[in-house]
Amino acid sequence: MGDKEMSEYYDPMLYLSAPGNANTMGCTVTLGEPIDGDILAEAAELLRERFPYFYIRVEKTENDLVPIPNPLPLTVRNTWEPIVFHTEASNYHLMAIKYEGKRLAVEILHGLTDGAGFLPYIKSLLFVYLSKKYHLSLDSTGFRLPGQEIPEAESGNPFAHLNIDAAEAPLYQKKPVKDFYRINPGDRGENHVFYVRLPEQEVMRYCRENDGSPNALMAVILARAIRKADPESEKTINITIAEYIARN
């Protein structure tokens, strides 16, 4: 794959961090008092030792993206405007922090991690920030902090045993889907909204115990419910989930 094709393929996955870009994700936290940007930046820099795999930039090679350590400071900005990853504005990082008033947000390239891998960073950032801001000695149990050993399962390459380059192209083929299952097969005027309520704590407990994602669990539950309600249909079931979760 040439440089031009590489650029067209990878650029959308590397750079823009904005609400409409599905290749990035973020977490917003609202505190009780205005954010101290200097302490927040200090906390972010301290966590570099514990989360080195988030403090990186990438180099494009002939057919791959190679992550390498990024010694430049992680950007901590007093603004709520989007930022472009892997540019001078973000110090060529694939993660950035912003704050405004009492709220802060950490944005990251989704290709680096998912929610399960991102949440420990958020928790640890808040732990260090609050400890320094209020001079607290908090129980560190359950937090990932500097000085701890980083397990291989956390930072290793799960695909190291696979020789992707040796596989013959195309790697994956799927027959085109001509039609999807529709709960409301009629005109738009006949559509209905169905509400399904699940206990949040039970859902999260199940996901943690099985190392799974709430999105995947919801998709499976809804798909199986549809199959049970209409077992004669063989149409493909498409589940779309809005990835916006607000917690007070």
Regions found by a protein language model. Give the residues of each.
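Acyl-thioester-dependent acyl-group transfer interface
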Residues: 1-61, 71-96, 228-248
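Short, flexible turn/loop "capping" segments at secondary-structure junctions
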Residues: 18-24, 98-100, 185-188, 198
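Amphipathic alpha-helical scaffolding segments
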Residues: 123-126, 223-224, 239-243
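Acyl activation and transfer enzymes in specialized metabolism, enriched
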Residues: 33-51, 107-123, 192-231
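Conserved alpha-helical substructure of the radical SAM core
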Residues: 97, 104-106
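Non-catalytic, low-complexity flexible loops and terminal extensions
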Residues: 2-5, 112-120, 124-205
